[in-house]
């Protein structure tokens, strides 16, 4: 039996953002599996370099484009290496907020 109807119902319940996140994650996983860690590491460095250049030039269009490329690479590495950055991000943001509060009290 075809699960097409069930798939269609699931897609209808998702928001466009959720749908795109799921589709992007699946494509990212396939890219990682095809090219592998070594090739994607080189690609990641290339994309980071392009973002740095765009930032230095203050080119808004290029910054947006290169940020998307870097986010794709981050997604692939998080999936491929099973990395969860959420708790570390929370720690670092809390540390920064504490610094801000400390600076305000001076």
Where are these regions (language model features)?
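Flexible "arm" and connector segments at domain edges
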Residues: 2-106
């Amino acid at each position: 039996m075809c699960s097409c109807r069930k798939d269609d119902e699931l897609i209808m319940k998702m928001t466009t953002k959720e749908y795109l996140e799921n589709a992007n994650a699946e494509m990212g996983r396939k890219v990682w599996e095809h090219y592998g860690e070594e090739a994607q590491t080189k690609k990641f460095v290339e994309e980071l370099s392009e973002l740095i250049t765009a930032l230095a030039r203050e080119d808004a269009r290029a910054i947006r484009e290169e940020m998307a490329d870097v986010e794709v690479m981050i997604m692939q590495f998080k999936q491929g290496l099973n990395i969860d950055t959420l708790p570390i991000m929370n720690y670092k943001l809390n540390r920064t907020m504490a610094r801000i509060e400390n600076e305000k009290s001076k």
